[in-house]
Curated annotation (Swiss-Prot):
The gene coding this protein: IGKV1D-8
Protein name: Immunoglobulin kappa variable 1D-8
Compartments in which it is found: Secreted; Cell membrane
Disulfide topology: C45-C110
GO BP annotations, alphabetical order: adaptive immune response; immune response
Main localization of the protein described in the UniProt heading: secreted
SMART domains associated with the record: IGv (SM00406)
Region (Framework-1): 23-45
Signal peptide: 1-22
Amino acid sequence: MDMRVPAQLLGLLLLWLPGARCAIWMTQSPSLLSASTGDRVTISCRMSQGISSYLAWYQQKPGKAPELLIYAASTLQSGVPSRFSGSGSGTDFTLTISCLQSEDFATYYCQQYYSFP
């Protein structure tokens, strides 16, 4: 008996797998922020669907690889200063820098790891 399944049919069946997740859209704001040393800075990240606490925050400086700051929405990576904090769950998350230092001037990214393409 021939058990081969056409690729098109297999793709269609995969769409109906129980628990299959759709793509998650992420919106980070503000896209550009002006701040001075000593300021309290807040960056938000909103998901198109709930991701529990499967969110990480990264800091990237020019010419360097991104560095993990926070994972599981609010857990500080070892060695990261306590002025950084994360909060939120579900669809809305926040990264806060309580007292901005000169070495904190960088690009910040949020990343969800609840669902992968």
